[in-house]
Curated annotation (Swiss-Prot):
The gene is phnW. It catalyses: (2-aminoethyl)phosphonate + pyruvate = phosphonoacetaldehyde + L-alanine. Homodimer. Its EC number is 2.6.1.37. The lineage of its organism: Bacteria, Bacillati, Bacillota, Bacilli, Bacillales. This is 2-aminoethylphosphonate--pyruvate transaminase. One of its GO terms (molecular function) is 2-aminoethylphosphonate-pyruvate transaminase activity. SUPFAM superfamilies: PLP-dependent transferases (SSF53383).
């Protein structure tokens, strides 16, 4: 299988050195391995610009969705009510999880190309005093829109509610101070902006809030409190952990620091995104999200014309060494291009040249 450049929001292109960390086998009970887990937990707090004992980090096996569900099942009690803010498929997935868990919920939904309003969140909290928790996706990779978690967080905090943020595709790539943002549970995954590989996610939680969650989970494997209770002692996971993935993630964290930290990575991602948007605009590709609402993570593009075949376009990009993403909208034809991972200006320039040549050939055919 060819080694493609993955222009996706994760899994993504990783460095050779991150991959090499997975060549060694490790024992889950070994003290050296458990220490790796503890170091990772501390480094995650550093990235979030918070520290112990006010905050704590918990690693959880599975994809990002597993970790989101672990927070919902653990943090939202039987007598609580959850307000879920949605403007994309991943917010809607949180709604689906909440319904399966039979949580009391309120849904505030806005169109996919619009940001939710903090004023509307305020109105909803004023109207329904029984709401105890508020959940929102930071970077909604359905479209690439970046939601205003600072403004929403200030409202949630003013009402003394618990704030849950799905920062799956932003944490580590967009600067975040969890305390300043009033986030109580921040959720992300190994295979996103920190540039590890799939296999586990993590939660950075306010310690005093997590401590109140004992016995609330409706799941054994996804009980975030119980996972934390065991892990905080010496780095042991309750159940078998993805040892190779953990080792790769530890290396990815080292490389994030070497790059200059989150601010430097954010700038690289933003530069990649600006280059992509400017060059594709000249070629007639219109972005679905306006520039001021666009995240530096992934961009959704409208098909340039009715005859455009995404399948053919996708295969031609793949032949040239690039893998892109299909669209996730139901009402309009789109595709997506990510620019995170081990991707640099020269990669984006090369991609744009391939797209330009493709469009020239197709235009000549017509």
């Amino acid at each position: 299988m060819s080694n493609y450049k993955l222009l996706t929001p994760g899994p993504l292109t990783t460095t050779k050195t991150v991959k090499q960390e997975m060549l060694k086998d490790r024992c889950t009970w070994d003290d050296d391995y458990k220490n790796v887990t503890q170091v990772i937990r501390k480094q995650l707090l550093n990235l979030a610009q918070v520290d112990e004992p006010h905050y704590t980090a918990v690693l959880m096996q599975g994809s990002g969705s597993f970790v989101v569900e672990s927070v919902l099942t653990t943090a939202v009690g039987e007598d609580d009510k959850l307000l879920i803010i949605t403007n994309g498929a991943y917010g809607e997935r949180i709604v689906e999880m909440a319904k399966v868990l039979r949580l009391a919920l309120v849904v505030y939904s806005v169109p996919y190309d619009k940001q939710p309003s903090s004023l509307e969140v305020q109105a909803l909290l004023e109207k329904d005093a029984s709401i105890t928790h508020v959940a929102v996706v930071h970077c909604e990779t359905t479209t690439g829109i970046l939601n205003p978690i600072k403004e929403i967080g200030e409202v949630v905090y003013s009402f003394n509610k618990t704030f849950i943020v799905d920062a799956m595709s932003s944490f580590g790539g967009v600067p975040m101070d969890l305390s300043d943002l009033h986030i109580d549970f921040c959720i992300s995954s190994a295979n996103k902006c920190i540039q590890g590989v799939p296999g586990f996610g993590f939660v950075i939680a306010k310690t005093n809030i997590l401590e109140k969650c004992k016995g609330q989970a409706r799941s054994v494997a996804l009980d975030l409190y119980s996972q934390w209770e065991v892990m905080k002692k010496d780095g042991k996971w309750r159940f078998t952990s993805p040892t190779h993935v953990v080792a790769a993630f530890a290396k990815a964290l080292e490389e994030l620091v070497e790059e200059g930290g989150v601010n430097a990575r954010y700038q690289r991602y933003a530069d990649n995104n600006l280059l992509l948007r400017s060059r594709l605009s000249v070629l007639g590709f219109e972005a679905y999200i306006s520039e001021e609402l666009q995240s530096p993570i992934i961009t959704t593009y409208l098909f340039p014309h009715k005859e455009f075949s995404f399948e053919h376009f996708y295969q031609e990009m793949k032949k040239a060494g690039f893998v892109i993403y299909p669209g996730k909208l139901t009402d309009v034809d789109t595709f997506r291009i990510g620019n995170i991972g081990d991707i640099y200006e020269e990669d984006m320039q090369a991609l744009c040249e391939v797209i330009e040549n493709y469009m020239v050939v197709k235009n000549n055919e017509n």
